[in-house]
Amino acid sequence: MPTTMQALVGAESGGYRLAENVDIPVPQRGSILVQVHAVALNPRDAKIVDFSNAPGSLGGCDFAGTVKKVGEGVTRFKEGDRVLAVTFGSNALDKTKGAFAEFALAEEDISCRIPEDFSFTQACSIGLSMATAGLAIFQAPGLELSLHGGKGEAVLVSGGATATGTMATQLLRMAGYTPIVTCSPANNALCQSYGAAACFDYHSPACGADIRVQTNDSLRYVLDCVTDTTTMKMCYEAIGSSGGSYIALETIATTVKYTRRDVRADWFLADAIMGNGVQMAGTYGRAPSPELRRFGKQLFALAENWLHDGSIRHHPLEIQDGGLANMPQALNDMKLGKVHAKKLVVPILGH
């Protein structure tokens, strides 16, 4: 096995650069070293190097591959196992953590064994959307819904055709809730195929009011996967007159937040699921949270079962070849909005 690798790391001037001869990290207690076969790209990967760059740190979150080494105390996995995992790259606290490399570290309890009928390109798209949707729906400061016993109550997912949106729709269905979504009419069939009970056109100025009518003024819970001023206003209009909870994936506009005192509004970072705290600029920093790590362990154990019994599906994929060398271009395509209703995936092994 080699001792060095290629990796995409934070550049001193911002953005990423392709680095040669990067030391392959050593798995510590509770972690595994994975030879990366494929990675998925997420908006976080493009944004983070602009607002909280960590030069020299490995980039990326979503990956899948084969286990090459296991750290002390690891019992779930062995060398040769096919796994998917999520990590949080561009991490100033630990620059060896990141997915955009030929080898990547994963935490044993924030990883899943891949079903035999799953390819690596499919599997690598699961981790971050699972972590994000799971935290948003089931944990504070998210909606804090029950993993079981939803009793059919409607929950709105704004951005139902995003990767987090389709995952959230599936998780809500399994927990007994009735997911309704906003999306473009062109994506109605896509969202319905993941379990959306109703789709509303976010282009319509009456979108929020229409949802409020259709839910009989009773909507209490909203997950906003888009998170801008327009979608936040729409979500506020949709929530019933008794108030409710709104959770976002980005910082939220206070100009909208305080227009309704009966709505609890907050936002979160999926990075917090690792429990180690988050060192980022401004309001993005997070204190350590063992409770969130315990939830992450529970969630990924469940996710492994759901994958193997077919309860959840991955988001539609767009595969770009070229390996690590093509990653800056792929990230730029995503940043410019050239990818719609698909998860961008790049095969690594063999490129």
From Swiss-Prot:
Organism of derivation: Penicillium sp
InterPro entries found in the cross-reference section: ADH-like_C (IPR013149), ADH-like_N (IPR013154), GroES-like_sf (IPR011032), NAD(P)-bd_dom_sf (IPR036291), PKS_ER (IPR020843), Trans-enoyl_RdTase-like (IPR047122)
Main enzyme class: oxidoreductase
Pathways per UniProt: Secondary metabolite biosynthesis
Domain Enoyl reductase (ER): from-to ranges: 10-346
An example Gene Ontology molecular-function term: oxidoreductase activity, acting on NAD(P)H
UniProt record similarity statement: Belongs to the zinc-containing alcohol dehydrogenase family.
Sites where the protein binds NADP(+): 161-164, 184-187, 202, 249-250, 339-340
Protein name: Trans-enoyl reductase grgB
Keyword annotations of the record: NADP, Nucleotide-binding, Oxidoreductase
Statement: the UniProt record of this protein carries the keyword Repeat: no
EC number in record: 1.-.-.-
Spans through the membrane: none
Gene behind this protein: grgB
Function description: Trans-enoyl reductase; part of the gene cluster that mediates the biosynthesis of gregatin A, a fungal polyketide featuring an alkylated furanone core. The PKS grgA synthesizes C11 and C4 polyketide chains in the presence and absence of the trans-enoyl reductase grgB, respectively. The polyketide transferase grgF is then responsible for the fusion of the two carbon chains to produce the furanone skeleton of gregatin A. Next, the cytochrome P450 monooxygenase grgG accepts performs the oxidative cyclization to furnish the gregatin scaffold and leads to the formation of desmethylgregatin A.
